[in-house]
Amino acid sequence: MPDAFDVSDDKQLVDQQLTRDSDSKPAAKPASKQKPPSKVPGVLAADPVPEPGAAPVQAREQGHAPQGNRKPAVLEPAYHESRVVRLARYVASWTGPVNPLPAIDVLRWATNLMQSFIDARAAAGGVPVFRMHIGLPVVVITDHASAKFFLGSPSSDLDREDFKRFGPLGVAPSLLKNAMPSLVASDATGHKVDRALTVAVMHSRFKHVDEALRQSQQIVYDDFMPGVFRHPDQYTIRDVAYKFVGQFMFKWLLNTTPPSLKALRGYPVDCIIDLQTSNWLGTLVGSALCKLKMAATHSSTLNAEGLDIVRHSRLYETYRKMAETMGYTTADLDLWLQFLVQFNGVAGIGLTLASAIAVLSEQLSTLDELRREVGDEPLRFDTVDGKFPLLDSFAYEWMRFFMGPRVIFKKAMKDLQVPTSDGNLYKVRKDELICAALPLCQRDGTVYDAPNRFNARRFLDNPSLKWQVFNFGFVEAEHNPKPVQTARFGCALYSAGVGLALFKVLIGTWIQRIDWECDQEFTFVGNDTGDHGPPNGKFSVIKPRQPKH
């Protein structure tokens, strides 16, 4: 694990972040030289430009070269709609700002997120790259090679949108105001400085990770879980997961206690709901629905609860001075910190932790093996990595199957050719919006055997396969001499050296201390949508195990 960074080291960290126009790397990984610029848009550099008849660089690296010596085909992304439907869409566009189709498209997509991509891919003939309308026209990528290119490309090729949104999914304006968290910032809107501040905040608290994790788990197991044991019908699996992660995140980054469970649960749900489309009517409908949703769930009151805790943290002034030193605006810094802690942290880890608990309720043999492996000794953040092979494999399969975000959007900054696992290239034009449907990309049968099945032992049998998992948004970049992971917009929590070990300690301690059964069966086997299980799934049986520690 990386050494702890003192606050006094933050200026050096920022200088390193701002003076390099390279991909961000996890703190725990060694630095490596960057590849020289590619001469062919859409083909990562370092290797020579392919000769006629050769596979694209990415295809050769992954073993997905075209059959024989055929030259890679350069294709236009297929449409998922028939010509008749596209003609009707064109005619409807004449109505301009009152065209109802963008509103219909975005509502249909937002209520059936990943399945809409699956249906559209089938309608487009099963190709890995296709065009569709989800309130905005997008090019959707759905296989491993295209996602690897998408995640690993520099911002000169692909950059975030210039707005606080993920495609049509906008952040409610009242939740951020002038703040621009790195999760929604492009290079044009200050992503480099923001990410430097995000990582610096985490590094300044790195030496407190283990103690914060120990204290937060003790509080939850001693004070919160007895209530769950007595009244399991009053808590969902997500409630319990959010409580564990929320207790840790607020203790670690703010040295305080979290808001109520209701406030923890409500913030991520009501954050990304401001639907935005390509015309006035669709955006108006989406914004109106956002305001109604927030009013119905009392979001303003619940969010104010968390915001008050942020403002009264003893570390708030430290972070404000840190932001000033780095040249980052301190306007709405409280909202920025709340987004970092509650959305990136609590929702980002909490949702997927709930999925792991649900999976293990179905895979009892895996649960038994994990219990034998981890034993009864307390798990520590600084020693859990590399000590438990099955737990490690389970963690990578967890990331492959469930890790968010499920969709990532970027804008093409130039004309590109996107490689795919079948060796073909797909044209994307400058300014087109690309959406990576990551659950589909992580279930590419050319990379993973039985990709739609959750297999906790997958990486025991083939440890090198770990490098093909998009680990917190990171991808394998090169071998020099060991594999190195990189990502322009990868998770800052992972960059700070925290993400994977945090999950292992949380789920490892859970299986040591808890016996449980769920009130329903979860259909994760064969599920390629990346869903985290029914949001209201509960425990039918839950009780403490012995011995405790």
UniProtKB/Swiss-Prot annotation:
<dbReference type="GO" id="GO:0004497">
    <property type="term" value="F:monooxygenase activity"/>
</dbReference>
<keyword id="KW-0479">Metal-binding</keyword>
<feature type="compositionally biased region" description="Basic and acidic residues">
    <location>
        <begin position="8"/>
        <end position="26"/>
    </location>
</feature>
<feature type="region of interest" description="Disordered">
    <location>
        <begin position="528"/>
        <end position="549"/>
    </location>
</feature>
<comment type="similarity">
    <text>Belongs to the cytochrome P450 family.</text>
</comment>
<dbReference type="GO" id="GO:0016829">
    <property type="term" value="F:lyase activity"/>
</dbReference>
<dbReference type="GO" id="GO:0016125">
    <property type="term" value="P:sterol metabolic process"/>
</dbReference>
<dbReference type="Pfam" id="PF00067">
    <property type="entry name" value="p450"/>
</dbReference>
<comment type="function">
    <text>Cytochrome P450 hydroperoxide bicyclase involved in the metabolism of oxylipins natural products such as egregiachlorides, hybridalactone, ecklonialactones and related bicyclic oxylipins. Isomerizes the hydroperoxides into epoxyalcohols via epoxyallylic radical.</text>
</comment>
<dbReference type="GO" id="GO:0020037">
    <property type="term" value="F:heme binding"/>
</dbReference>
<dbReference type="GO" id="GO:0005739">
    <property type="term" value="C:mitochondrion"/>
</dbReference>
<protein>
    <recommendedName>
        <fullName>Mitochondrial hydroperoxide bicyclase CYP50918A1</fullName>
        <ecNumber>4.2.1.-</ecNumber>
    </recommendedName>
</protein>
<keyword id="KW-0456">Lyase</keyword>
<dbReference type="GO" id="GO:0031408">
    <property type="term" value="P:oxylipin biosynthetic process"/>
</dbReference>
<keyword id="KW-0925">Oxylipin biosynthesis</keyword>
<dbReference type="InterPro" id="IPR036396">
    <property type="entry name" value="Cyt_P450_sf"/>
</dbReference>
<dbReference type="InterPro" id="IPR001128">
    <property type="entry name" value="Cyt_P450"/>
</dbReference>
<feature type="region of interest" description="Disordered">
    <location>
        <begin position="1"/>
        <end position="75"/>
    </location>
</feature>
<keyword id="KW-0443">Lipid metabolism</keyword>
<dbReference type="GO" id="GO:0005506">
    <property type="term" value="F:iron ion binding"/>
</dbReference>
<feature type="compositionally biased region" description="Low complexity">
    <location>
        <begin position="27"/>
        <end position="41"/>
    </location>
</feature>
<keyword id="KW-0496">Mitochondrion</keyword>
<feature type="binding site" description="axial binding residue">
    <location>
        <position position="491"/>
    </location>
    <ligand>
        <name>heme</name>
    </ligand>
</feature>
<comment type="pathway">
    <text>Lipid metabolism; oxylipin biosynthesis.</text>
</comment>
<dbReference type="GO" id="GO:0016705">
    <property type="term" value="F:oxidoreductase activity, acting on paired donors, with incorporation or reduction of molecular oxygen"/>
</dbReference>
<keyword id="KW-0276">Fatty acid metabolism</keyword>
<keyword id="KW-0444">Lipid biosynthesis</keyword>
<keyword id="KW-0408">Iron</keyword>
<dbReference type="GO" id="GO:0006633">
    <property type="term" value="P:fatty acid biosynthetic process"/>
</dbReference>
<keyword id="KW-0275">Fatty acid biosynthesis</keyword>
